[in-house]
Design a protein with these regions (language model features):
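Short coil-to-beta transition motif at edge beta-strands of beta-rich domains
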Residues: 37-53, 160-167
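Well-ordered beta-strand positions in beta-sheet-rich domains
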Residues: 46, 58-62, 70, 177-183, ...
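Short structured motifs
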Residues: 124-129, 187-188
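Intrinsic-disorder/low-complexity, polar/charged segments enriched in Ser/Thr/Lys/Arg/Asp/Glu/Gln
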Residues: 31, 139-141, 165, 179, ...
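Small/polar beta-strand repeat architecture
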Residues: 2-7, 15-30, 36-39, 53-126
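Acidic, glycine-rich flexible loop segments
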Residues: 144-175, 185-187
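Short beta-strand and beta-hairpin "edge-sheet" elements
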Residues: 169-214
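Oligomerization/assembly interface segments of phage tail-like spikes and tubes
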Residues: 129-148, 196-211
Length: 214
């Protein structure tokens, strides 16, 4: 068991993705192995993965290179063939690069990601039951110290206004790293309170899972 603390954490985004490399096969293994001709990756590269598997697609993963035409996806256990349909995981990979620091982060919070349930009550029973039907969408909200002259903040505003998708990276001081991918939204209107720094919220509405590495 280990504990992590927020002090020293860094936050980054990227809208820079290399050309897509076609994944012609994705194995039902732990970790899953991707067949991708002349991928050009090195171990530890961060990739945006698009796949027919719902729990894999639109997420950022790290790779371990096996050879010039294949790599494994760190942390992806696809051995459950009932959940990861054989042959359906094909798609593409794009290397993520050009990480940009998110400036003056004061707080971070997450929303959603919790299970959704539907309540069912058969007529022959007095006791209703909750049946799981999936998960609520996930999002992350950061509170930033407002500085309209900050170049990174201006870049974030541009991404927000054009409804562009970005990668998100949170690195803790102990080495753990979490990734996300989705739409970035940044406010231009600061909040003002006596005795406190002016702030603006920035949020990321994630399209896929948040993937974490120790």
């Amino acid at each position: 068991m280990a504990y992590a603390f927020p002090e020293g954490a860094t936050f980054n985004f990227s809208s820079t993705f290399a050309s897509a490399k076609t994944i012609t096969a994705l194995s039902n293994a732990n970790p899953a192995v991707a067949t991708c001709t002349a991928h050009g990756y090195t171990t530890g590269d961060e990739i945006l993965l698009t796949s027919g598997w719902e729990d894999v697609t639109d997420s950022i993963w790290r790779v371990t290179v096996i050879d010039a035409n294949s790599f494994s996806i760190q942390g992806l256990d696809a051995s459950n063939t009932s959940f990861f349909a054989p042959g359906a995981g094909t798609g593409s990979a794009q290397k993520v690069s050009g990480w940009t620091a998110i400036p003056q982060v004061l707080t971070i919070s997450s929303q959603g990601g919790d299970p959704r349930f539907t309540t069912i009550q058969p007529l022959a029973k007095r006791n209703a039951i909750n049946v799981p039907v999936g998960f609520n969408p996930s999002s992350i909200t950061l509170t930033l110290g407002h500085d309209a002259s900050n170049a990174q903040y201006q870049t974030m505003l541009g991404i927000s206004r054009t409804l562009s998708k970005v990668g998100f990276k949170m690195a803790l001081s102990g080495g753990a790293t979490s990734y996300g991918y989705g739409y970035m939204a940044v406010s231009e209107v600061p909040s003002l309170n006596n005795g406190q720094a002016n702030t603006v919220p920035a949020s990321l509405a994630m399209l896929g899972r948040s993937i974490s590495y120790a």
